[in-house]
């Protein structure tokens, strides 16, 4: 399971890349979604590589992001352990995070919005014009790199 975060805006973005981002449920800058590691999604991620940061997050970071930024599909309730136990198939947020990482379920299947609306990164980006290899934020991150980004945007 990969976490995708849109870092660059839609100005001068080709329409097929905009369409791909919408298919991935990312509609604005600083929005995040979780996608499985299948060939279809791998191709979509490769297409939007220059506009997003992505990588496989750790369970602890995913728990933090879900606790602070997850929203129900309907209503405006806070998502906490009680809400998860009452409305999903899991007992708490850590169980849900483990199931998401092992690709047993999706956010939408559990009644949560597939888009996580994140805060801009505290301390700023390392650079949204360059890939990770050049010292920027764009492209594929290792687990530690995507964890740092998601933690800054929690």
Curated annotation (Swiss-Prot):
<keyword id="KW-0699">rRNA-binding</keyword>
<keyword id="KW-0687">Ribonucleoprotein</keyword>
<dbReference type="GO" id="GO:0000463">
    <property type="term" value="P:maturation of LSU-rRNA from tricistronic rRNA transcript (SSU-rRNA, 5.8S rRNA, LSU-rRNA)"/>
</dbReference>
<dbReference type="InterPro" id="IPR016082">
    <property type="entry name" value="Ribosomal_uL30_ferredoxin-like"/>
</dbReference>
<dbReference type="InterPro" id="IPR018038">
    <property type="entry name" value="Ribosomal_uL30_CS"/>
</dbReference>
<keyword id="KW-0694">RNA-binding</keyword>
<comment type="subunit">
    <text>Part of the 50S ribosomal subunit. Binds 5S rRNA.</text>
</comment>
<comment type="similarity">
    <text>Belongs to the universal ribosomal protein uL30 family.</text>
</comment>
<dbReference type="InterPro" id="IPR005997">
    <property type="entry name" value="Ribosomal_uL30_arc"/>
</dbReference>
<dbReference type="InterPro" id="IPR035808">
    <property type="entry name" value="Ribosomal_uL30_euk_arc"/>
</dbReference>
<dbReference type="Pfam" id="PF00327">
    <property type="entry name" value="Ribosomal_L30"/>
</dbReference>
<feature type="region of interest" description="Disordered">
    <location>
        <begin position="114"/>
        <end position="146"/>
    </location>
</feature>
<dbReference type="GO" id="GO:0006412">
    <property type="term" value="P:translation"/>
</dbReference>
<keyword id="KW-0689">Ribosomal protein</keyword>
<dbReference type="GO" id="GO:0019843">
    <property type="term" value="F:rRNA binding"/>
</dbReference>
<dbReference type="GO" id="GO:0003735">
    <property type="term" value="F:structural constituent of ribosome"/>
</dbReference>
<dbReference type="GO" id="GO:0022625">
    <property type="term" value="C:cytosolic large ribosomal subunit"/>
</dbReference>
<dbReference type="InterPro" id="IPR039699">
    <property type="entry name" value="Ribosomal_uL30"/>
</dbReference>
<comment type="function">
    <text>This is one of 5 proteins that mediate the attachment of the 5S rRNA onto the large ribosomal subunit, stabilizing the orientation of adjacent RNA domains.</text>
</comment>
<feature type="compositionally biased region" description="Basic and acidic residues">
    <location>
        <begin position="123"/>
        <end position="144"/>
    </location>
</feature>
<protein>
    <recommendedName>
        <fullName>Large ribosomal subunit protein uL30</fullName>
    </recommendedName>
</protein>
<dbReference type="InterPro" id="IPR036919">
    <property type="entry name" value="Ribo_uL30_ferredoxin-like_sf"/>
</dbReference>
């Amino acid at each position: 399971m990969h976490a995708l975060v849109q870092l660059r805006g839609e100005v001068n973005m080709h329409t097929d890349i905009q369409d791909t981002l919408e298919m991935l449920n990312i509609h604005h800058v600083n929005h995040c979604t979780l996608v499985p590691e299948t060939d279809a999604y791998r191709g979509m991620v490769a297409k939007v590589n220059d506009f997003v940061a992505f990588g496989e997050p750790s369970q602890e970071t995913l728990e933090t992001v879900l606790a602070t930024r997850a929203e129900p599909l309907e209503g405006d309730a806070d998502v906490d352990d009680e809400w998860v136990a009452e409305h999903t198939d899991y007992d708490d947020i850590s169980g849900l995070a483990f199931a998401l990482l092992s690709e047993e379920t999706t956010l939408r299947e559990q009644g949560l919005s597939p888009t996580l609306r994140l805060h801009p990164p505290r301390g700023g980006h390392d650079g949204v014009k360059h890939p990770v290899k050049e010292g920027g934020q764009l492209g594929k991150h290792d687990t530690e790199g995507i964890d740092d980004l998601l933690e800054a945007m929690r």
